């Protein structure tokens, strides 16, 4: 294909492109618009940006600038009549006025119209055709366009030709700051969602994950409110032999992506799902895996997915060979790779299951080390721990976090929730009861002692052995003992896992009496956190929390 033919194909003035030109008042002579450009073209443009290179394995290495993680304190929801009575207002969803929205939207448009290249990505969120939404992303960095091309569900040529008007539009002008003096602003970054306009704007942060998580919040609103479909911060996979579905709940860094990428099971998705009356479907068309300390030995499927078409974010590489040093966290602990889900050999395409979950896994990364590697949960304990959403905030997943911090994140996804946590928890309880799902709490964090006191991270091979025993049914038939205070049921034996690892009260490095003090401290944090929910929780759920003698 000749250069002129290629340019005509990629940057031609389609109806969509013409609409964007008119909306942004773009010059035909100055600005090139690329709609759903292929990876090779986005590589070509991306490599013109400072520091962007190709890794030795073929991935595009890009950098997000100052912000290398999400900025949850800068998230805003526009307070407007159609959604204000549904939104869970507070620290998670801070309101901004429609006037502030208009100012910032125009500021984003002003910036975009100064660019010589604008990228449009038209794609879908949600694999179930009954519930999917059409998403349009408008941005000025090729890296952002490739990222969202990977993370959304890519349309066929026919679907793209008949795409029509989007259901939701993202305007990403992240290279340009918000005006700190504008009402409702707390910094020069803002991520604003307007459910009336069905649009999102991004200013003051180039971290690509803001686009992905913004769409997630949109689905946390649209699916329950308009379709009675439960949106979940979870990964999901399905047994090849019998089709059993497992959901993994957990915050960033707890192991959702790693544990759901299992060569013995089909991957439905690694992060964002919906549970409808028909089964489970993935929201995304790609995976956004953490890369810190990545190795081919520990995580071969993720390692092998880092190839042409993938985006590596904020990694360090050898300048001569372009081999990435995945152990180097000098830019951030939150190094990431975004790749299409079909780069995982065991991915199930389309990414949905017409059966309901058999096993529910609540993942926590406990930096205190007092929770066991695995415990079986009663239905009431599931609700208590789902609403609590305890984990340790892992280094790098947010700005300023450099070592694990204990935190509670309701529904294991509090930064992304649009509605009150009790609404999601009630929907989950109903679905688990209807479909008789089993539930387990798995700690992928520290064991033997706390992070501070020299405890060790639970080896991945043991966590995988625990999951194998859940999936083959053997764990359900083991003998259990009760862990004090939390009253968790802990197995005395798990195939492939050292018995001394299973009960933290017995393997605590400072002795069992010191363990009791540590577990009491964590239990007090649980009780304190749950006070904000106790007026709406049932007595059975309250009784499923820590009990002090």
From Swiss-Prot:
ATP binds at residues 250-257. GO terms for biological process: gluconeogenesis. Pathway: Carbohydrate biosynthesis; gluconeogenesis. Its EC number is 4.1.1.49. It catalyses: oxaloacetate + ATP = phosphoenolpyruvate + ADP + CO2. NCBIfam families: pckA, PRK09344.1-2, PRK09344.1-3. It holds the Pfam family PEPCK_ATP. This is Phosphoenolpyruvate carboxykinase (ATP). GO terms for cellular component: cytosol. GO terms for molecular function: ATP binding; phosphoenolpyruvate carboxykinase (ATP) activity. Homotetramer. Keywords: ATP-binding, Decarboxylase, Gluconeogenesis, Lyase, Nucleotide-binding. Belongs to the phosphoenolpyruvate carboxykinase (ATP) family. It comes from Saccharomyces cerevisiae (strain ATCC 204508 / S288c) (Baker's yeast). InterPro entries: PEP_carboxykinase_ATP, PEP_carboxykinase_C, PEP_carboxykinase_N, PEPCK_ATP_CS. Signal peptide: none annotated.
């Amino acid at each position: 294909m000749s250069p002129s033919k290629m340019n005509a194909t990629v940057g031609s003035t389609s109806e969509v492109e013409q609409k964007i030109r008119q909306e942004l008042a773009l010059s035909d002579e100055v600005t090139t618009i690329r709609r759903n450009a292929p990876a090779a073209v986005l590589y070509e443009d991306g490599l013109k940006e400072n520091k962007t290179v190709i890794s030795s394995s073929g991935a595009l290495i890009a950098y997000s600038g100052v912000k290398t993680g999400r900025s949850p304190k800068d998230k805003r929801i526009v307070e407007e009549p159609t959604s204000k009575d549904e939104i869970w207002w507070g620290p998670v969803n801070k309101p901004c006025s429609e006037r502030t929205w208009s100012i910032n939207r125009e500021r984003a448009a002003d910036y975009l119209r100064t660019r010589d290249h604008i990228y449009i990505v038209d794609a879908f969120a949600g694999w179930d055709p009954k519930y999917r939404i059409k998403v349009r992303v408008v941005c000025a960095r090729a890296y952002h366009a490739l990222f969202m091309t990977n993370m959304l569900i890519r349309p066929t040529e026919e679907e793209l030709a008949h795409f029509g008007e989007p259901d939701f539009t993202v305007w990403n002008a992240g290279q340009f700051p918000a005006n700190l003096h504008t009402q409702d602003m707390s910094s020069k970054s803002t991520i604003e969602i307007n459910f009336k306009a069905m649009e999102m704007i991004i200013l003051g942060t180039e971290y690509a994950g803001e686009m992905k998580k913004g769409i997630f919040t949109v689905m946390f609103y649209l699916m329950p409110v308009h379709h009675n479909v439960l949106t979940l911060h979870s990964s999901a996979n399905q047994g090849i032999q019998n089709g059993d579905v497992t959901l993994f709940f957990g915050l960033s860094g707890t192991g959702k992506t790693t544990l759901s990428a299992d060569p013995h099971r089909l991957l439905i998705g690694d992060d964002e799902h919906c549970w409808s009356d028909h089964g489970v479907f993935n929201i995304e068309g790609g995976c956004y895996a953490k890369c810190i300390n990545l190795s081919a030995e520990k995580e071969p499927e993720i390692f092998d997915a880092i190839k042409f078409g993938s985006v590596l974010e904020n990694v360090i590489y050898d300048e001569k060979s372009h081999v990435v040093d995945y152990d180097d966290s000098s830019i951030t602990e939150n190094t990431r790779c975004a790749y299409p889900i079909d780069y995982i050999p065991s991915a199930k395409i389309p990414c949905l299951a017409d059966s309901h979950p058999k096993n529910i896994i609540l993942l926590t990364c406990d930096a205190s080390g007092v929770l066991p590697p695995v415990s079986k949960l009663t239905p009431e304990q599931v609700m208590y721990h789902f609403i609590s959403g305890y984990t340790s905030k892992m280094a790098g997943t947010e700005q300023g976090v450099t070592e694990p911090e204990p935190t509670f994140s309701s529904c294991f996804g509090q930064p992304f929730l649009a509605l009150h946590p009790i609404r999601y928890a009630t929907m989950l309880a109903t679905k688990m009861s209807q479909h008789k799902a089993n539930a387990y709490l798995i700690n992928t964090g520290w064991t033997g002692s706390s992070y501070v006191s020299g405890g060790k991270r639970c080896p991945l091979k043991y966590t995988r052995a625990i999951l194998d025993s859940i999936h083959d049914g053997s764990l359900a038939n083991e003998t259990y003992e009760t862990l004090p205070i939390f009253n968790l049921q802990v197995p005395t034996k798990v195939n492939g896992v050292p018995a001394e690892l299973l009960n933290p009260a017995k393997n605590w490095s400072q002795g069992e009496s010191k363990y009791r003090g540590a577990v009491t401290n964590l239990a007090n944090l649980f009780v304190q956190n749950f006070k904000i929910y106790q007026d709406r929780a049932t007595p059975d759920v309250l009784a499923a929390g820590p009990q002090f003698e």
